[in-house]
Structure formats: structure tokens, C-alpha cells
Amino acid sequence: IDIIDGMTTKPFGKGPFYPGIGVGGHCIAVDPEWLKAASIKAGFFPKIIQHSRDTNNSMPNHTIRLLEKLVNLRENKVAVLGVTYKGNIDDPRESPFYDIKKILLQKKVDFSVFDPWYRKENTVDSIDKALDEAKIVLLVTNHDLFKEKITVEFLKAKEIKIVIDGRNCLNKEEIIKQGIVYKGIGR
């Protein structure tokens, strides 16, 4: 965490990045590839850059495998919350959402999508409707709306059984205390 805190002192960008469901955007997901290509051209293969990209690219699959260990996905509706690659922006470029969506479609899983900042992928028009009939919440993006709205009371009222917190921004202890299965990606 000290390293992450130190990274917030950089004179560009918007805040820190934490381990989670994957990275996106026009820089973090792309710039390492340029550095890797330049390194290879200079005669050096940057294993750590490749390993980092492989790890980040595998997070959507890891997330779905984690869910499959808990429940039969075809028998449980999933509420996918968030499309953009980070909270409180309307930029979906390189977001892990797209890999999550592709996997869920391939597996023929019933799911809803809601993002208050980027509505082009929404299948419903509110977080309330996204959770209707869902048993699983899969949080992809840490929008403030989600952090405020996804309370234990809300989850209980919607009869949610499992929460996959892809950004580690929800109240883990309170969720678990209520008997809801909680898994944080990157914890």
C-alpha cells in the first residue's frame, strides 16, 4: 500500500490504481506493449512486463472461474455493475468488462449490465433493475454510485447471495457478517 500511496504523488493521471479485476484505458493497457516492443528491438525480452500483461489479461477469466467454483452460473442471474475501466469516468477503452461480457455470453449466462457513466452497454436503466432476480453481483467498476448504493441492506433486500468485488471497494466485513458470500479480486 505504501507504494500505491507514493504513486498518487505523480503529476499526471487521476489517483492510484489498486489490484483488481483488470486494467484498461488508453495508457496502462497499451503502453507496456510499446516498451516491450522497444526492448525486444534492442535485444532484450522484458519478462516482467510480459508477465504483468499476462496477469492483467487473465483477470476476467480468473474472476469467472472463481464464480464457477461457488455456483452454477447458468442457474443464477449475474448483475454486472460497471463498464468503464475505472470509477467516475465515461471511458470504456480496454475495460475488463468486455472480456467478462464475452465469457458470460459464451457460457450462456443470464446477466444484466448497468453503468451510470457509460450507458451504451446497459441492459437496464438503474442499479435496482440490474439486481432484479440476480443472485450474484459482479462489480467491475468502482463508481461512487455503486459504493454508496451497494449496502448490506440493499443486497439483503435484493436477495443477493454472492458479491464479487472486482475493485475491493465494498464493505467486506459487513457483507460477510450478513451471510452473503464475498470475494474480492486482488485481495
What are the roles of these predicted feature ranges?
Residues I1-R187:
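Structural/interface elements that position substrates and couple domains in central-metabolism enzymes
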